[in-house]
């Protein structure tokens, strides 16, 4: 029977987890090690911030390592600890290959039951992370975190007791606090103070439906006089609707989002996007994918931004643990700024193009 596109994509992204090495398995305790090394060769150019040069690079692309320990108590109850690290650029230095530092991306503990769901505590993904359906390896044109945070310091609940259905809720806590000065221990300016989000996604019987809503509060640091215009709260929503034509190996989807940002002593901002996309199985172990995005961000009687972006890519599994791909993206942003005192407007257009060839080796 022909493999469905979803199965291939899930297999490609979950290879490190599904094929992780079991280093210990005894009396209900299981410890796994896994990860991937990823390299991308790319060419890009941009007119953002008046940059006019073209750049080539050979760099790390989200290489990672994880360890997962699961302890089964019996009667479906379990506890789990998970730690994932990433290779990133050094905070100080000029290296551009993104291999400078190792950071902790996720670190959390889970208590759960197969029938009743699980509670997760720590630095982890939220329910908003998996809502949209668009596929990408590196140059994703969607930025869901502008609408709802997709990870953070969280207490979350997830229920997967019904086949194909995932229900989730998260409460976000502050993750960044001042270490120096008079505000030691206070949440840093413009970082998350707290937030809440809920979501649901159904993926079964060739139908994909998902929606999430979140309200996130940010520290605006109002004691500073120059904080007018800094965001205080973001109310956002994300949704997806898709259908999988199993016989054709084709998935078509439509992602969308809306957010309203409340700014301190300033006019509020509104943004939304719509993004149709597709994923197509060209042949066994080879997939074609792409999506288009239109996004608009506006302030009443103020600055307006419109972005058009498109992405296409092809990936191929050389081996169950080796994935290669070619991906390219183009984005065009048009910004209109209105000067109410002079009753004039200025328009600026920025463009960004990128294309890359990548290789991932899972272990």
UniProtKB/Swiss-Prot annotation:
Domain of life assignment: Bacteria
Signal peptide range in chain numbering: 1-20
Subunit (UniProt): Homotrimer.
Keywords on record: Cell outer membrane, Ion transport, Membrane, Porin, Signal, Transmembrane, Transmembrane beta strand, Transport
Keyword Plastid among UniProt keywords: no
Function field: Forms pores that allow passive diffusion of small molecules across the outer membrane.
Topological category with respect to the lipid bilayer: Multi-pass membrane protein
Pfam families xrefs: Porin_4 (PF13609)
Major subcellular location class: membrane
The name this protein goes by in its record: Outer membrane protein P2
Family matches, as InterPro entries: Gram-neg_bact_OMP, Gram_neg_porin_domain, Porin_dom_sf
GO cellular component term, pick one: pore complex
GO MF annotation, one: porin activity
One GO biological process term: monoatomic ion transport
Subcellular location: Cell outer membrane
Lineage start: Bacteria, Pseudomonadati, Pseudomonadota, Gammaproteobacteria, Pasteurellales
Record family assignment: Belongs to the Gram-negative porin family.
């Amino acid at each position: 029977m022909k493999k469905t596109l979803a199965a291939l994509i899930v297999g490609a992204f979950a290879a490190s987890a599904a094929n992780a090495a079991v280093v210990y398995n005894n009396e209900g305790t299981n410890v796994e090690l896994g990860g991937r090394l990823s390299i991308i060769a790319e060419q890009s150019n941009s007119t953002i911030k008046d940059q006019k040069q073209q750049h080539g690079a050979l760099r790390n692309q989200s290489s990672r390592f994880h360890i997962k320990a699961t302890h089964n108590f019996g009667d479906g109850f379990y506890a789990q600890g998970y730690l994932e690290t990433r290779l990133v650029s050094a905070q100080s230095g000029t290296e551009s290959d993104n291999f400078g530092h190792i950071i902790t991306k996720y670190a959390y503990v889970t208590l759960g039951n197969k029938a009743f769901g699980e509670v997760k505590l720590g630095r982890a993904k939220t329910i908003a992370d998996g809502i949209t359906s668009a596929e990408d390896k590196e140059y994703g044109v969607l930025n869901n975190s502008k609408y709802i945070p997709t990870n953070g310091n969280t207490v979350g609940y997830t229920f997967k007791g019904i086949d194909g259905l995932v229900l989730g809720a998260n409460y976000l806590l502050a993750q960044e606090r001042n270490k120096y000065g008079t505000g030691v221990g206070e949440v840093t300016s413009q970082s998350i103070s707290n937030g809440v989000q809920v979501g649901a996604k159904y993926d079964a019987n060739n139908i994909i439906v998902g929606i999430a809503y979140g309200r996130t509060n940010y520290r605006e640091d109002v004691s500073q006089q120059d904080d007018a215009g800094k965001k205080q709260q973001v109310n956002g929503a994300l949704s997806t609707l898709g259908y999988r034509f199993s016989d054709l190996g084709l998935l078509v989807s439509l992602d969308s989002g809306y957010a309203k940002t409340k700014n301190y002593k300033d006019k509020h901002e509104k943004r939304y996007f719509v993004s149709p996309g597709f994923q197509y199985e060209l042949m066994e172990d080879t997939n074609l994918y792409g999506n288009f995005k239109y996004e608009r961000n506006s302030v009443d009687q103020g600055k307006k931004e419109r972005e058009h972006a498109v992405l296409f890519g092809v990936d191929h599994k050389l081996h169950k643990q080796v994935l290669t791909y070619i991906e390219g993206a183009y984005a065009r942003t048009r910004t209109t700024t209105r000067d109410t005192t002079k009753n004039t407007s200025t328009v600026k257009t920025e463009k960004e193009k990128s294309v890359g060839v990548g290789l991932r080796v899972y272990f």
